[in-house]
């Protein structure tokens, strides 16, 4: 099962209208689903619900394509991956790696110097938490950027995304093969 994110940015989990329904689904998945992948906002929500790990709100939304390091090269999830892979990130929160590592059932599989913890799994490999967006199309970050501009927000240009940091330039995709591998390996 995949539980995906939502553009809720700084909204506290308990303030989300459907938090009770979501936690019911998360609880149900523990007994009725072989493996659950929590993506972006849902990763932080899942870590909070299942393990009490508090999210840390960022002062500025993280948006762009960042280098990530595979820490556990023997993990079946990263079979075929290079040591370093690019992954889009688009989020207003993070978790402290130290908080994750305090939980014996959790293992950090990939990190980024710029984006922090990227992929976490449970000891039994029944839950995976992915903070980024390997599923993004080439124009998804652009659409988010222009959407936020249209809302009157002042978003930063997504890092490492538009050639020459110019939003008029077509983005170059550097994460597609990693995304294909990630989801194929997860399945």
Regions found by a protein language model. Give the residues of each.
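Redox-cofactor binding/interface segments in oxidoreductases and associated redox assembly factors
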Residues: 2-3
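Amide-donor transfer/coupling interface in amidating biosynthetic enzymes
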Residues: 70-187
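Cysteine-nucleophile active-site neighborhood
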Residues: 6-72
């Amino acid at each position: 099962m995949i539980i995906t994110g939502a553009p809720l940015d700084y909204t506290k989990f308990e303030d989300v209208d459907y938090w009770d329904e979501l936690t019911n689904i998360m609880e149900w998945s523990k007994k009725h689903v072989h493996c659950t992948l929590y993506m972006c906002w849902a990763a932080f929500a899942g870590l909070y619900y299942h393990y009490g790990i508090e999210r840390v709100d960022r002062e500025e939304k993280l948006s762009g394509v960042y280098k990530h390091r595979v820490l556990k090269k023997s993990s079946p999830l990263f079979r075929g991956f290079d040591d370093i892979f690019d992954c889009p990130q688009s989020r207003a929160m993070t978790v402290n790696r130290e908080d994750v590592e305090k939980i014996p059932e959790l293992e950090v599989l990939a990190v980024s110097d710029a984006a922090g913890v990227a992929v976490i799994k449970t000891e039994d490999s029944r839950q995976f938490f992915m903070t980024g967006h390997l599923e993004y199309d080439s124009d998804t970050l652009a659409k988010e950027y222009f959407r936020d501009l249209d809302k009157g927000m002042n978003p930063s240009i997504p890092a490492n995304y538009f050639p020459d940091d110019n939003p008029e330039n077509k983005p170059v995709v550097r994460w597609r093969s990693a995304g294909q591998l990630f989801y194929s390996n997860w399945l």
